[in-house]
Amino acid sequence: MRRVKRNTDLTTNLGSVTLPNPIMTASGTAGYGNELSEYMDLQEIGAIVVKSLHAEKWEGNLAPRLHPTPSGMLNSVGLQGPGVKTWADEKLPALRNSKARIVASIWGSTVQEFTEAAFHLRDTPPEVVAIEINASCPNLEDRRKLFSHSIQAITEVVEAVNVVKKPLWAKLSPNTPELPDIAEAAHKAGAEAVVIANTVLGMAIDIESRKPILGAKRGGLSGPAIRPIAVRAVFDTYEAHPELPIIGVGGINCAEDALEFILAGATGLQIGTAIFRDPRICKKVIEGLSKWCERHEVKKISDLIGGAHD
């Protein structure tokens, strides 16, 4: 496939990980492998972040699991998956063949479960450039408080996952006023970057049955509705810790949305819900960023990071 030569340098550095551009898929929106390969050359995307994987096979939540909203989507899939070892054996080879840069996302409900999931990834090939810790999971050892809502818990889980000896990213929840402090704690514990932010807590009720629509009752809201929340979360975290690489996610639908996150302080970007509407959206946003930078005579996209703080 012919590559388009760009006049703007989109190179993105996230700790020790270097990507050709800042755009990635968000975990849970592009499957476990090369599902998007029929729509684009996966090498053109900064990285593919696979759906979060548990140490063991996981069945997920009861249906219904998805519900559209006026400006987004509620989901309560419950992190259904084949288990990290099965993924590495059965799904990873095809994704490697696509020459994509891969980020494996893992989750657990105890520190030990995170450790076990990471252990299965210790011998993954170099195409797996980073491990994303989905810390927006209930901690069964702390009254179901989310790992990403506790400085102590995020510290423990990041330190435990370091057994994998690959760059770590911590995906955090926006549903806490302590987000900048928790991001700093994750960084000090060994995360080279933080992903901000996961879904916002939400719910929908069927007025005829008078019951919650989702099978698990509660869910996470994603899509354009949460973009202002995520942009502020990135802004606040960058303001407190400008040295910390941030990957912004939440409601990105176009290059202009992506630029908001970059100016707020994001170095990398993930696109999620928009992929369901347009599986080519990542490529379109990359092209849009390049064109915007050329129009504004921006030579390196990294020069824009945190620009709204100047």
Q: What do the predicted segments below correspond to?
A:
Residues 1-102, 107:
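N-terminal capping/small domains of soluble enzymes
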Residues 1-6, 221-245, 253-310:
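Alpha/beta catalytic cores of nucleotide-metabolism and tRNA/nucleoside-modifying enzymes
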Residues 18-24, 98-103, 163-174, 239-249:
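Short beta-strand/loop segments at the ligand-binding rim of alpha/beta enzyme cores
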Residues 25, 48, 87, 104, ...:
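Conserved, mostly hydrophobic/aromatic
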Residues 30, 105-108, 172-178, 244-256:
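Glycine-rich beta-to-alpha transition loops that act as phosphate-gripper elements at the mouths
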Residues 34-39, 114-124, 176-189, 239-242, ...:
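Catalytic cores of alpha/beta
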Residues 50-55, 130-131, 135-137, 193-203, ...:
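Glycine-rich phosphate-binding active-site loops on the catalytic face of alpha/beta enzymes
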Residues 73, 137-152, 182-244:
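Glycine/Thr-rich beta-alpha phosphate-binding loop at enzyme active sites
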